[in-house]
Regions:
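Short, charged/polar surface micro-motifs in flexible loops or helix N-caps
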Residues: 60-63, 85-87, 108-112
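Short beta-strand His + acidic residue motifs that chelate non-heme Fe in jelly-roll/DSBH
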Residues: 64-66, 82, 88-97
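A short, acidic/glycine-rich surface segment
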Residues: 39-44, 88-92, 114-115
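Short aromatic/basic micro-patch
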Residues: 49, 81, 106
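Generic protein-terminus/edge-of-domain signal
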Residues: 1-66, 70-73
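A hydrophobic/aromatic-rich effector-binding and dimerization subdomain
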Residues: 2-3, 91-158
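Short acidic-glycine-tyrosine-enriched beta hairpin
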Residues: 69-84
Length: 161
């Protein structure tokens, strides 16, 4: 019988799933991860609730991801935004995992509350994110996103490819 129980996923626990050489961050409040397939990622095939804010950008590859029991096909140039308490599960990982490449930004609610963010705007757009947390970025935004992620990596000391 398949184990379908959920568990809470914190940033500290999330970091355990990826090699230290592929991640950087600020204690357990902020983490930037260059996600390549690793056997430890199979743990994400079990439902979990992330207790912070997570943004996952698909550089290359296809996986299926369930967010709040809705299944999404994640492909190149997709941006996934998960809000606190979202139920997450990787539902399908392709056999050829060499081509999978994602960049993940995860932050605690406490860290996010310290950022200068217009929460009125976030809340109004947050309703849309609850309905559809997966966005396919237009081609002109893809290059801008790559530059932004490179800048974040440089400032944090990470080495993203």
């Amino acid at each position: 019988m398949e184990n379908t129980s959920t568990y809470n996923l914190s940033i500290s626990r999330l970091k355990e799933y990826f090699p230290a050489s592929h991640r950087t961050g600020i204690s357990d409040d902020f983490c930037l991860i260059d996600v390549r397939f690793d056997g430890r990622m199979h743990k994400l095939e079990h439902p979990c609730r992330f207790d912070g804010i997570m943004m996952l950008y698909c550089v290359k590859g296809n996986v299926k991801l369930s967010i709040n029991l809705n299944e999404y096909e994640i492909a190149d140039n997709s941006l996934i935004v998960c809000l606190p308490g979202n139920l997450l599960k990787v539902t399908e990982i392709p056999e050829d995992t060499d081509g999978l490449h994602y960049v993940m930004i995860a932050m605690s609610q406490n860290f996010a509350s310290g950022l200068r963010i217009d929460f009125k705007k976030v809340l109004s757009e947050g309703v849309a994110l609850l309905k559809d947390p997966v966005i396919t970025l237009p081609e002109n935004v893809k290059e801008l996103t790559a530059h932004y992620l490179s800048l974040m990596a440089e400032l944090s000391g990470a080495e993203l490819e």
